[in-house]
Amino acid sequence: MAYHWQVIGRLLIALLRFYKRFISPLLGPRCRFAPSCSEYAMTAIARFGPLRGSWLAARRLGRCHPFHPGGFDPVPDAPTSSPSSCRCKGPHP
């Protein structure tokens, strides 16, 4: 099942690269954030997978409007998977 999520993630990143290469130049620079929303989405999907990465990208797109000041807004770091930082009650390998 993990393989399917990797394929979906690669497909989403390929679509974002297509947008950035062919569509974005026609629209001109519009993003008020650094990194741009498309770069943010590609990084989020690569770091967190297609499901959570897409959610983070959608939240970012929701903030990209004329009434938001914008600025530097990096993708959050991936959480560490140490037993001390986990809230689950199951054993860790």
From Swiss-Prot:
Cell inner membrane recorded as keyword: yes
Domain of life: Bacteria
Localization of this protein: Cell inner membrane
Keyword hit for Membrane: yes
Region Disordered, residue ranges: 72-93
Membrane topology: Peripheral membrane protein
Keywords: Cell inner membrane, Cell membrane, Membrane
Cystine bridges: none
A Gene Ontology cellular-component term: plasma membrane
One Pfam family of this chain: YidD
Main subcellular location of this protein, as a coarse class: membrane
HAMAP family in UniProt: UPF0161_YidD
NCBIfam families reported in the protein's UniProt record: membrane protein insertion efficiency factor YidD
Functional summary from the UniProt entry: Could be involved in insertion of integral membrane proteins into the membrane.
Family (UniProt): Belongs to the UPF0161 family.
Protein name: Putative membrane protein insertion efficiency factor
Species, as recorded: Xanthomonas campestris pv. campestris (strain ATCC 33913 / DSM 3586 / NCPPB 528 / LMG 568 / P 25)
Lineage, highest ranks first: Bacteria, Pseudomonadati, Pseudomonadota, Gammaproteobacteria, Lysobacterales
